[in-house]
UniProtKB/Swiss-Prot annotation:
Organism in which the protein naturally occurs: Rickettsia rickettsii (strain Sheila Smith)
The protein, known as: Small ribosomal subunit protein uS5
Transmembrane segments: none
Protein family per UniProt: Belongs to the universal ribosomal protein uS5 family.
Keyword RNA-binding: yes
UniProt entry keywords in alphabetical sequence: Ribonucleoprotein, Ribosomal protein, RNA-binding, rRNA-binding
GO molecular function, one term: structural constituent of ribosome
Amino acid sequence: MSKVKKNDETLSEVLVDVNRVTKVVKGGRSFAFSAYVVVGDKAGRVGAGHGKAKEVNEARGKAKQAAKKRMMKVPLYQNRTIHHDVVGKSGAAKVILRRAKAGTGVIAGGSMRAIFDSLGIHDVVAKSIGSTNVYAMISATFDALNKLASPKSIAMRRDKKVNEISVKSADIQVNE
């Protein structure tokens, strides 16, 4: 997806992970904090970023700035779910995202739920397979979101009309 201009006042921020990291130096150990943040406007734009600093708040601020730099636009179906089922991978992590009927809600694990809430998705079913590492799962989720396409963009790519394209969940096969 394409990069998007950011607007600070409309962005929601979710702190996904905070770790204390240690660097061993000649005089002993040096401690710092690592933070992972997901930001979004709840209307189809989302980004994730990582920051490291001596204090938690500084690390969180750096992570938020990194997330705003990496924001992307995701096409939503009826402003509540994704257009089609998709699989994303990152290392040993694999996520399967499936569109859901209205009223289903967000059925997803911790870090994926933060992404969907920041994105503004209300109905989706997500399954993680393999690694449950927070960084890998978020990366795999973003890989899946990058593969999403609206019927309009698919039709333009194929030089067809939107009504000539049919996307059914049953037609998509997921290799596990």
